[in-house]
Structure formats: C-alpha cells, structure tokens
Amino acid sequence: MSNLFENNPTEVELYPIQEHILNELRNTIRYNKRTVLMAGTGLGKTQIAIQIIKQALKKEKRCCFVCHRINLVEQTSRAFYLQGIHHGVIQGNHPDYFPHRPVQVCSVQTLAKRDQYDFDIYFFDEIQVFFKTHKQILKNNPDAFFIGLSATPFTPGLGQYFTALCHPVPIKELIQKKILKRFDIYGPNTIDLTGVRTVAGDYKKDDLEKAVDKPKLTADIVDTWLRLARDRKTIVFSSGVGHSRHLEKEFLKRGIKAKEINGYMRKENTEYDIGANQIIEDFRNNEFQVIISVEMLVAGFDVTDVSCVVFATSTKSIMKFCQGVGRGLRKHEGLEDCLVLDHGGITERLGFPDEFEFIQLDDGKHAESKNKQQEKPEQLPKACPSCDFIKPAGVQKCPACGFKPEFVKDVEVSEGELKKLQRKAKKE
C-alpha cells in the first residue's frame, strides 16, 4: 500500500508549509485508504492534490478529482492545465470530455450517474459538503483510495466514511506565520432573532430571512460598511436571494458598485454557470467592489484581494462561520488584514474563528461531543460599547480605543451598531 505515496521529486516547488502538509498527508494515507486533509484557506489544497496525482501518474494510476459545484470544476480544470496535467472533464455535456485520460475532473452529480469509470484515487473537494452521491461513489469503489479536502470538515457523521483526519497546521499558526491575513471583527451588541426557529442545528432559512431582510437593517449594514470599510474589496453573506438583491440595491443607491450572485444564474438550457462565473471574474478584475451571496461563495472562492467580509445574516454553524471568514484571509501582496463585520452576533455566540480546535472526524457518536467540547471557547468575546471592537471575554480595557466600561447591566443599542470584538487576555 505505501509504495504508491513515496516521496518522489515534483516539478513545482512548494512552499515549506505545503511541503510539511504534503509529507503529513503521505504519512497518513500510507496506512488509511480514506483520509480527510484539513488545511486552512489559502494553503493550496488543490496544489497538494496535484503533487499526489503526479506521483500516482508515474505509477500508471488513474485519478479522479470530484467537485460539488460547476464553477469549482472549471477552476480545478484550469489549475490542472497550468500544472501540465492533461485530463478530461466529466460534467454534463462539457466539451473537454476525454474519458480515456488517466486524470479526470468531475462534478459529483454527473459522476454518480455515470459511475462506470475505474479509478485508483479519488479526491473529494470541499468534503464538508457531503452528499448521498459521495456515499454512493465510496460504496461502489471499496478498493480505491479516497482523500477528502476541506478547511472545515465538521460535517456530522463524516467519520463513518473516512477513517483518518490529517490536520497539520491550525489556522492560528498560519496567521502568526503571516501565511494568512490577520483579522479584526466588529459585531453587534444585540440582534433580534426572536421567533427564528432552528432546523438541523442552524437557523431556519425562511425565518432568518424574514428577521434580517428589513429596510432599516439593510441601510444600517451599508452605513457601517461605509464607515469602517469604504475602500475595501468586500464579500457580503446574506440570508437569501431576495435579501441579496435588497443589499445590492442599497449599495448601488449609495454609489457603490455591487453585484449579487446566486446559484440560479445559468444560461438557458445548459448546466454551465456562465452568468455566475462572469460575475466572479468581473469581481476578480475589480469591475465592481462588493459581491453579495447567500452561500455560493463560502467554498472554493479564491479572490485573494478581498479584505472585508460582511455577515448580513446569522448562523449557529461553526463551519459556515469559519468558511465565510476564510474568504478574506488569503494572502495578497500589499494587504495585511481583513475586516469582518458581524451583524449576526455570530462571534459573541460561537467565539473567534481561529480558536476552534478539531481533533477528530465526527462519526455521529462520540466524536461529536468531544469535538464540540474542544471547539467552543469557555468564555465568549464581547463588544466594546465605545468603538465597536470585539474583544475577548475577560478584557475590560479596549485595546483599540482604550475605553474601560463601568460594571453595569445590559445596555440597549440599536440593531445596526457594531462593536469591535477583542480576544481574551492571557493571564500572567
């Protein structure tokens, strides 16, 4: 089993941190046929997969890279060609359908329908999005190697299908080493989620959109952005397509070039997300400043000069929160930080996204409680009532503005006011 993953020379020079991750992954998959690689935003998980694929090709092995979205199929295919990997694409009626080639980039939906192919290694990109079709492919190929890739493999029950977790470098270490941008978070003191029900561990979408998609709050969100992030390239996460469109109109009304993007932007009678892909490319090329989406941009979105992430919605999901913040953390020359505007009170509810620990995959039984115990900080951050900076629990004097509040009970504030969140002070 182990000879498939020997440390052969590669043509592309990896960064030292990528070499470390690749070596750790090799060590794990030598003894586990079903492994999940947990690697943070911007670490080049696709590039690491490419190195494994190049080694496998030398041993005449067939490889399949599986994506759950069409734009990720196109993005991965482009990366493979840039690295000299000739491949086919199995996705709808894609023009690059060359099934005889030993490497294929596939959409999980199409592959499941045409699962007559024989591969030695499967890569599941963004494995936190784990469909029944993924399970079907696993079941139909018991002798193959499977490598899941994710920055946030927190999906309940994932450990029932994968036996090992490879987690070489925590996100906090990546920020300390300046591999990722540092971040500050501004968040609201209160938000009214009264009556918003919880379904499958997160807020019910219809209820959430009704609570959040209000003209006053929409205006507050744009006002706050103008005050704190006017010159920053920005991603906004909304509660629904209608909410996205209202936010877009509000930004445009203020003279800010903004566009909303959603999963329905397909050219008529085709599977290709031409409309959505064009919007992403225009955003990448600075044709407009603010892009707005529900969940379409939480995974596989690699525009590195984003320096502001706005949560115009709320969530109880650590995975969604970490994914969203991660969209703004990729390293980019000339940018040192990312500003997070948390209008949903997420940070005060869950904690800072670089403080969650993850020690094993959730098998739906014991792992769930163990990970949650490790993930959630004992004390949660609070907002400075003076400057909006979110500070850690236990920190009284604000490191941003120097304000030290008196000990008083809850203070009412308007739902649009943001407060900078601060981290917990270390005991001497």
Where are these regions (language model features)?
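Walker A/P-loop
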Residues: 31-52
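Post-DEXD/H (motif II) to motif III coupling segment of the RecA-like Helicase ATP-binding lobe
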Residues: 129-185
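Conserved helicase ATPase core of P-loop NTP-dependent helicases/translocases
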Residues: 89-99, 245-246, 256-294
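Conserved pre-motif I regulatory segment
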Residues: 2-38
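A short beta-strand element within the Helicase C-terminal
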Residues: 119-120, 289-314, 320-327, 337-342
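Conserved Walker A/P-loop ATP-binding site and its immediately adjacent core
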Residues: 46-48, 57-80, 241
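Conserved interdomain linker/interface between the two RecA-like ATPase lobes of SF2 helicase motors
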Residues: 168-238
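Conserved segment of the helicase C-terminal RecA-like domain
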Residues: 327-357
